[in-house]
């Protein structure tokens, strides 16, 4: 039998913070969306993360389990399928810019 601690875990909830939504947007929770812009008539499915300075164009669909990193722009009328990941992967140095955000460029 395991000992059960009476202490409570730290639970961090992000949810939806500082998001600019267009008209007629549908979001299915749970999601993590922060500092991004979502165009008119968009759909965002569950278990999606959309980070700072990201733009999703009008009438675009982001299906479940997607990850969209900072500084990514998705155009109008796009369909982003289940589990797609957009990362800021411009490797001008020949290696990832991990830890050096000043080297990130919009994609």
Where are these regions (language model features)?
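Flexible, glycine/small-residue-enriched loop-and-beta-strand segment within the central core
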Residues: 2-17, 26-107
